Curated annotation (Swiss-Prot):
Its cofactor is Zn(2+). Zn(2+) binds at H139, H143, E220. Keywords: Cell inner membrane, Cell membrane, Hydrolase, Membrane, Metal-binding, Metalloprotease, Protease, Transmembrane, Transmembrane helix, Zinc. GO terms for molecular function: metalloendopeptidase activity; zinc ion binding. The chain crosses the membrane at residues 4-24, 33-53, 154-174, 195-215. GO terms for cellular component: plasma membrane. This is Protease HtpX. GO terms for biological process: proteolysis. It comes from Shewanella sp. (strain MR-4). Its EC number is 3.4.24.-. The gene is htpX. The active site is at E140.
């Protein structure tokens, strides 16, 4: 109940802030052009703000400890491996971090190729062989080199804009329909209108999530291919095989799991940010 209340309160707060900002800027959201400007500003704005603070959020959320001076041979090997792969991929050395988790997982994040973070869990670092860890690191470095963070941010911005725009257009149509059948012609009223917008935001948001997940799965295949070039196909396959034998990933927040090595499994593959491990292994084997 608390989560639902917070979700509703957050949505209403965003709508209120959006309306105030648009009023200050003099944007008329009652016209299609004004509404599209409103949708684009908040659709892309939210996505790019998330990208800009992604490294900071990852460090705080996951409790990442950035390695500046290696404390042992394992950390030294980790830094040297990422440095070598980054050089091969033609990108600036990412920050390298470790976070405490029994799960075998890792992720890459950051606003650009030259300002990124690669983090691995203790479960992965100490639970896999060096060859397997090297395959995972190559996968994450490939995400950075491919510019996946920016690409998915642009896609997220587009679908956010669609959700905001479409929800309010449909709500406007419903309001006009109710108004035309109402003797007083008052329509839905402010609170009913906001409730309709909220529901439509949720429904269109589900569709948007499916679209983003589709592109995310494509980027995963590309990152696997990049890892095979950087570390060797056998190391990447070995890493995926090892992950397939382990438990399902569950602890990583969505904004990080999109660029993790091991995504959550779902009965509905359409909603998965990562292809099933079996399909990823098969794709590498047939390369």
């Amino acid at each position: 109940m608390k989560r639902i209340f917070l979700l509703i309160a957050t949505n209403l707060a965003v709508l209120l802030v959006a309306s105030i900002v648009m009023s200050i800027l003099g944007v008329n959201t009652s016209t299609m052009g004004g509404l599209l400007v409103f949708a684009a500003i908040f659709g892309f704005g939210g996505a790019f703000i998330s990208l800009a603070i992604s490294k900071w959020m990852a460090k705080k959320t996951m409790g990442c400890e950035v390695i500046t001076t290696p404390r042992d041979s394992t950390e030294r090997w980790l830094l040297e491996t990422v440095a070598r792969q980054a050089q091969q991929a033609g990108i600036k050395m990412p920050e390298v971090a470790i976070y405490q988790s029994p799960e075998m997982n890792a992720f890459a994040t950051g606003p650009s190729k030259d300002n990124s973070l690669v983090a691995v869990s203790t479960g992965l670092l100490y639970g896999m062989s060096q060859d397997e860890v090297e395959g995972v690191l190559a996968h994450e470095v490939s995400h950075v080199a491919n510019g996946d963070m920016v690409t998915l941010t642009l896609i997220q911005g587009v679908v956010n804009t669609f959700v905001i725009f479409a929800a309010r257009v449909v709500a406007g149509i419903i309001n006009n329909f109710v108004s035309s059948n109402d003797e007083e012609g008052e329509g839905l009223g402010m609170f009913a209108y906001m409730a309709v917008v909220f529901v439509l935001d949720m429904l269109f948001g589900i569709l948007a999530s499916i679209i983003v997940a589709y592109f995310s799965r494509i980027r995963e295949y590309r990152a696997d291919e990049g890892a095979a070039r950087l570390a060797g196909k056998h190391k990447m396959i070995a890493a995926l095989e090892r992950l397939r034998q382990g438990p399902e990933s569950s602890a990583m927040p969505a904004q990080m799991s999109a660029f993790g090595i091991n995504g959550k499994r779902s009965m509905a593959e359409l909603m998965m940010s990562h292809p099933p491990l079996e399909k990823r292994i098969a794709a590498l084997q047939t390369r």
